[in-house]
């Protein structure tokens, strides 16, 4: 965001139940986050803008383009599941209440385990601390509901309705979301641009930062068109 902020006005939106956003809601489903983006733009008077989302954020961004096409000029998805079944098995299991409950009631052990596994997820040395910080700002309900909802998501039937420029950015070594989800995106949105990062996993913005920023900025700088 620092680099893009030199050329664009940028906003980082924390979904309900995550980061600095409110934690007192009855549901944290993908559809709730789609509505949140629409409401956020309405409140700030943003008529139309490019949306860039990582992981579930990209799934939400693409869903906004489908449900609120007047809001979106471009979409960039980064390591995002188009179909929820593409999530790694441990993540899908974490969407079940009893497993999520065990994890959150053994949070210290859970965080320790993730720290040990972090080199397998992302090579950037900053990643363990970033992950630990994010976990500390997440509730059991938001984690459980969002993962369970994402697991059931399937955008394939709606993809042909997307008429704005789309780019998918995927790491070939992703072990959180199946790295070939770019194929699903390309099949549903034939005009989508795809950029693959051979040496990156689920976090290409960290592992191949310079290339990531250059590719993203090049896409955003292109003239807006309706397809």
Question: What would you call each of these model-derived segments?
Answer:
Residues 5-52, 214:
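Active-site loop/oxyanion-hole signature of alpha/beta-hydrolase fold enzymes
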Residues 164, 178-187:
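Short alpha-helix in the alpha/beta-hydrolase fold that links the catalytic acid
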Residues 192-227:
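Catalytic active-site module of serine/aspartate enzymes centered on a nucleophile-bearing elbow/loop
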Residues 86-91, 105-161:
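Conserved alpha/beta-hydrolase catalytic His-Asp/Glu region
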Residues 15-19, 82, 201-204:
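Alpha/beta-hydrolase active-site loop signature
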Residues 162, 168-170, 174:
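Short beta-strand/loop motif that positions the catalytic acidic residue
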Residues 53, 57, 61:
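Gly/Ala-rich beta-loop-alpha elbow adjacent to hydrolase catalytic centers
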């Amino acid at each position: 965001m620092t680099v893009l902020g030199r050329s664009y006005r940028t906003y980082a939106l924390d979904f309900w139940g995550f980061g600095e956003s409110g934690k007192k809601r009855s549901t944290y489903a993908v559809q709730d986050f789609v509505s949140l983006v629409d409401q956020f733009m309405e409140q700030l008077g943003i008529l139309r803008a490019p949306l860039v989302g990582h992981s579930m954020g990209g799934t939400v961004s693409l869903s906004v383009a489908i449900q609120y096409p007047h809001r979106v000029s471009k979409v960039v998805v980064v390591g995002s599941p188009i179909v929820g079944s593409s999530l790694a098995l441990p993540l899908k299991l974490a969407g079940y209440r009893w497993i999520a409950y065990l994890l959150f009631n053994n949070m210290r052990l859970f965080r320790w385990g993730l720290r040990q596994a972090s080199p397998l997820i992302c090579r950037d040395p900053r990643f363990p601390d970033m992950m630990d910080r994010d976990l500390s700002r997440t509730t059991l309900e938001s984690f459980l509901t969002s993962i369970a909802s994402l697991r059931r998501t399937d955008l394939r039937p709606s993809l042909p309705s997307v008429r704005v420029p789309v780019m998918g950015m995927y790491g070939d070594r992703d072990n959180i979301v199946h790295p070939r989800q770019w194929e699903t995106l390309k099949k549903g949105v034939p005009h989508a641009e795809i950029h693959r990062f051979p040496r990156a996993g689920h976090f290409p913005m960290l592992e191949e930062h310079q290339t990531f920023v250059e590719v993203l900025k090049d896409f955003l700088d292109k003239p807006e068109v309706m397809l």
